[in-house]
């Protein structure tokens, strides 16, 4: 079955699961006959004539999860899903697999966007935040994730050979600069805030200083933000910065971004919102300072229409320390992982995921792949580190673009595991 059919069906599973959990509580593990009328009303409201995997409304979601795990655990059954052609096209191959025929039948109904729009109707749900379908489309088609969803900037950091990792800068920021060393700019993030500035062993004159915003953060907006001087990062003291400069009753400094030509005072109680799209933050100091560190603390979001180049290509760089789980898919795998442990199936599924991943890599590299070059030191559900291995294992025949496609392809399969595996229970 085509990639997009999988995505649309998983979006429908996500919608129905959210609806039932909200209606019946977190203890729900499957459909029973008592759920039929409620679910039938929901499907009627969605104008869905053929609901794919729920053709028989008495089919428990638990059975669906069990079938999916069995399907995914055998690479000759899910082999088409592991091929580049599955990701790149919407063809509909002839399938004979029981799981696909029984539960993921093609939906000749309203498009998934209309399904989502109607499911999110306030008359049906007053506070539902659906979690996975939007980022599936963001990864696959470079569509935008929801702008109301907060983004943790620390998840977006991209280390490169010439630029250290985000948390890896802590030690250097805490180490005094030597005498005669030129001023050094920095831009880091911890949960809920960004910290940027210029460290200097000598006094910096009152002037304008341009601090470059890393490209992986230039796709963000910040709302409900406060801007202030600081000298800490991850609980440690940043050296060679001054935090308590005085200028009487006047501001010590203000910042300005290219997308907003209004001054934003530093150390103010003002609550501000602005975009980092300009790529540069201008810092104007009113008094000499021995370096400065400025924090932006607020709610970060993706800018509208800026996701296209973000996740689907240019931001994924070569290296083992590249975090890839930007949209937090790993936390959605925990429900399934706990069910695997409870059923005693964790090791078996881990072996299946290793085989699946190796087969996917081999499909993208054809005859050039050396399986001995890939060694996963972390379990299957720690996807950021696994993706880092894919981006960094030594094989001169595999270029960065191919590695990016592998990561994106595997991310979508993980999203299906998070959706279809949430009710797994073999007992």
Curated annotation (Swiss-Prot):
Pfam families: Phytoreo_P8. InterPro entries: Capsid_hemagglutn, Phytoreo_P8, Virus_capsid_a-hlx_vir. GO terms for biological process: fusion of virus membrane with host plasma membrane. It comes from the Viruses. It is found in: Virion; Host cytoplasm. Its main location: virion. One of its GO terms (molecular function) is structural molecule activity. Belongs to the phytoreovirus outer capsid protein P8 family. Homotrimer. Homomultimer. This is Outer capsid protein P8.
